Amino acid sequence: MFLEAVYHRPRKNWSYAYNGTTVHLRIRTKKDDMTAVYALAGDKYMWDHTMEYVPMTKLATDELFDYWECEVTPPYRRVKYGFLLQQGHEKRWMTEYDFLTEPPRNPDRLFEYPFINPVDVFQPPAWVKDAIFYQIFPERFANGDTRNDPEGTLPWGSADPTPSCFFGGDLQGVIDHLDHLSKLGVNAVYFTPLFKATTNHKYDTEDYFQIDPQFGDKDTLKKLVDLCHERGIRVLLDAVFNHSGRTFPPFVDVLKNGEKSKYKDWFHIRSLPLEVVDGIPTYDTFAFEPLMPKLNTEHPDVKEYLLKAAEYWIRETGIDGWRLDVANEVSHQFWREFRRVVKQANPDAYILGEVWHESSIWLEGDQFDAVMNYPFTNAVLDFFIHQIADAEKFSFMLGKQLAGYPRQASEVMFNLLDSHDTARLLTQADGDKRKMKLAVLFQFTYFGTPCIYYGDEVGLDGGHDPGCRKCMEWDETKHDKDLFAFYQTVIRLRQAHAALRTGTFKFLTAEKNSRQIAYLREDDQDTILVVMNNDKAGHTLRCLSGMHSGPICGTTMS
């Protein structure tokens, strides 16, 4: 046994309450080192009568390690536990202090989950597990009211998008096309920012309490939210709390009054006057963008202002949650207070952070419910679209992430394949719809909440920003009807089978130098086998004996 690789800690993703009665236990071992792993678990006050060996299953594997998991339901909501590691006939018992060659005589030195306190259980909104999101960039979705068009608005779709052009998209345009969303089958919408700003993307907020007049007003948003709710569609708005815009009145005051401004501590200012020297602003910003000064969210007045805005739009319009821009650059303390305020306003609100990398520190139940799952995006693109990862590497990329988060976080992770910040999926696939369909099929049959970027379903293409922000095509003769029907099919498939949303996931085939995968999604009602060939040539796969016990074991698939 390679005991140096064995790892467990009684916290985070290794030992956590999945709900009010169940604890999930995980342990890491060297890849292919153990033939079996068990948790020995029981009540410390009734150890002799309650201790049992619980078999652990292999949750995931990466290049170096296997990750094992089991579920225990302690009758009194507390559990003492250790692990039995087995390599053939060799056995080791792992306690909190050491490895033993014999079973521990008493539970004193075992690990402990002291008590499942309901208030401490990380519980994302249940509805998100069943959600299928559709992302809308409002300025480019539909122009429903030409009276609010900004000066210089171009005719719809008459030119390629630029960083500064406007086409007149607005909230009324979304209202006018809700039938399209219902026909597609989505049940949640995420809007990029709607609040008053100078740009077409609105990530430079001027007023956090006003809908940009270009899009409509608060009443229009309220009408849109109500109409969406009537159709069973949830609504998520974008909050830009890392930075404001240059026209944000407190920043304008600092520009005007400098050291005398009562708002100078609302921002991270290194020197006055505010200026840009050799391309670097004298104040902190998003990236080095002078139009986006970074907010000091530790300042009590800033904190109060932003938290009031977060609560205001939930109470005034009934939105179902927030997506948080540049969330990883804002303090954890602020996000903890944000969660408290938002969940008080709507306990069922979904809090989604924009974090592009490993995110476990935000997913412990005190900050976000989920993050935008770009590591998932990268894995899917590497395997299906760019074909720079083989099946084994693909499974490793996903396995490492799956083992890194508690299950309830994985169930609501925001799984996207493209967005307003990336090239469109069809463009990345070089127009190959076969690749695109495989990627989408995996997205809809994997853990997490899938999101469709507006227009993907009708064949919209486009490179990186601003190319990915084209006007939505509303001429149905130009729609890719085959692609639209495919999206409808995978949406119906996911909605019809709970196993695809919350069931277990297991790769059956994901081999080195292979472009074929097979995996199972399984719950008490369904066992769903998914087989994909990401190669132009045909292949035959066989489910190996012992990989799964059931009717499909030993099946040959061509």
UniProtKB/Swiss-Prot annotation:
Q: How does activity depend on temperature?
A: Optimum temperature is 50 degrees Celsius for hydrolysis of beta-cyclodextrin. It is elevated from 40 to 50 degrees Celsius by addition of Ca(2+), and the thermal activity is retained more than 80% at 60 degrees Celsius in the presence of Ca(2+). The optimum temperature is between 40-50 degrees Celsius for hydrolysis of soluble starch, and it is 50 degrees Celsius for hydrolysis of pullulan.
Record organism: Bacillus sp
Under what name is this protein listed? Cyclomaltodextrinase
User: Could you say how this protein's activity is regulated?
Assistant: Hydrolysis of beta-cyclodextrin is inhibited by Cu(2+), Zn(2+) and Ag(+), and activated by Ca(2+), EGTA and EDTA. Activity is increased over twofold in the presence of 5 mM EDTA. Competitively inhibited by acarbose and methyl 6-amino-6-deoxy-alpha-D-glucopyranoside by reducing the rate of the ring opening step of the reaction.
General function of this protein? Hydrolyzes alpha-, beta- and gamma-cyclodextrins and the resulting linear maltodextrins, with the highest activity with beta-cyclodextrin (cyclomaltoheptaose). Soluble starch is hydrolyzed slowly, but it is nevertheless preferred over pullulan as a substrate. Is able to hydrolyze amylose and amylopectin, with a very strong preference for amylose, with maltose and glucose as the main products. Maltose and glucose are the main hydrolysis products of cyclomaltodextrins, maltodextrins and starch, whereas panose is the main hydrolysis product of pullulan.
Q: Which top EC class is given?
A: hydrolase
Tell me the Pfam families matching this sequence.
Alpha-amylase, Alpha-amylase_N, Malt_amylase_C
Quote the EC number.
Answer: 3.2.1.135, 3.2.1.54
Q: Which gene encodes it?
A: CDI5
